[in-house]
Amino acid sequence: MVRTINETFLKACRGERTDYVPAWYMRQAGRSQPEYRKIKEKYSLFEITHNPELCAYVTKLPVDQYNVDAAILYKDIMSPLPAIGVDVEIKSGIGPVIDNPIRSLQDVEKLGEINPEDDVPYILDTIRLLTTEMLDVPLIGFSGAPFTLASYMIEGGPSRNYHNTKAFMYAEPKAWFALMDKLADMVITYLKAQINAGAKAVQIFDSWVGTVNVADYRVFIKPAMERIFAEVRPMGVPMIMHGVGAAHLVNEWHDLPLDVVGLDWRLPIEEARARGVHKAVQGNMDPSFLLAPWSVIEEHVKGILDQGMKEPGYIFNLGHGVFPEVNPDTLKRLTTFIHEYSKGQLAK
């Protein structure tokens, strides 16, 4: 069964003009929703993602509640790592913890390959369920980027400074590039499988790449990213790049064969465009504003929209994920305001 979907988000990704600015929010499915918190009382994140019906429900919930223009599959960037031999546990209040961190070329060589239909069939089944029976907006698939995945695999968990990761990168370049190649292979296969299952766009999250300077990015990270985007591009769906604290890297991303450059709040949209970023742009509200009074939110969002709408190809989003403390009613009101305000401005 082929469902008719609202393609406003996809049009914006392709740099086309739209009647209004499409919006979705990173971590829109999850921590701020009472319904989700009740589910989490009974099930862990990995238990939810292993249950296609439950995972599809969680993924669709913000579409119904907030009227956003895209759904993003509920899962974690660590979800594919067990398939290649990495033991991951999501610990409450900490995040992903890995008991067998990478320390040598031999550790890298032990990593296997992912076969999505065998290793993560529940993720693909969730995508099929959502796209054939449930959603009337596009579904975004996603993956972590090699650098961010490598940082968890080397540090053994979250880090404030990523000293071990960068030390490994500098001191063991042969092992580093072997790891980047292994992870790039995994990301390519994983994203292609999500697209084949029905994802209409994909986003790559490089959450911690902002810790790397431009010169090191070009040498140690960009080659893997170029290969990922080049090999996934023939699949014909929009591809989005997003990182946090990475304003100094947006021109490097713009050079990649992708469609949408994601921005966080540290770099104004108009400044990114002044630097030469003229692909579609996604962003870039500081999620902290969602805890402010509505009058403050409205004025701030107007400013972001006014910048974003100056060129076709703009998607409203946050610069990072929704906080648990955010009132779901605020997100619903925000989506309505984005749609109505942008529609009025674009009609002028």
From Swiss-Prot:
> For this UniProt entry, what is the primary localization, expressed as one broad class?
cytoplasm
Question: What CDD domains would the database entry show?
Answer: URO-D (cd00717)
Q: Where is the protein localized?
A: Cytoplasm
Q: Name the catalysed reactions.
A: uroporphyrinogen III + 4 H(+) = coproporphyrinogen III + 4 CO2
Pathway per the UniProt entry? Porphyrin-containing compound metabolism; protoporphyrin-IX biosynthesis; coproporphyrinogen-III from 5-aminolevulinate: step 4/4
Q: Name one GO biological process term.
A: protoporphyrinogen IX biosynthetic process
- Cellular component terms per the entry's GO annotation: cytosol
Q: Which UniProt keywords apply?
A: Cytoplasm, Decarboxylase, Lyase, Porphyrin biosynthesis
- Under the GO molecular function aspect, what terms does this record hold? uroporphyrinogen decarboxylase activity
Query: Which parts of the sequence bind substrate?
Result: R27, Q28, A29, G30, R31, F46, D76, Y152, S207, H320
Q: Which PROSITE patterns match?
A: UROD_1, UROD_2
* Entry EC no(s): 4.1.1.37
Site residues (Transition state stabilizer), renumbered to this chain? D76
Subunit info here reads: Homodimer.
Stated role: Catalyzes the decarboxylation of four acetate groups of uroporphyrinogen-III to yield coproporphyrinogen-III.
UniProt similarity note: Belongs to the uroporphyrinogen decarboxylase family.
What is the official name of this protein in its record? Answer: Uroporphyrinogen decarboxylase
Ranked from the top, the taxonomy reads: Bacteria, Bacillati, Bacillota, Bacilli, Bacillales
Gene that encodes it: hemE
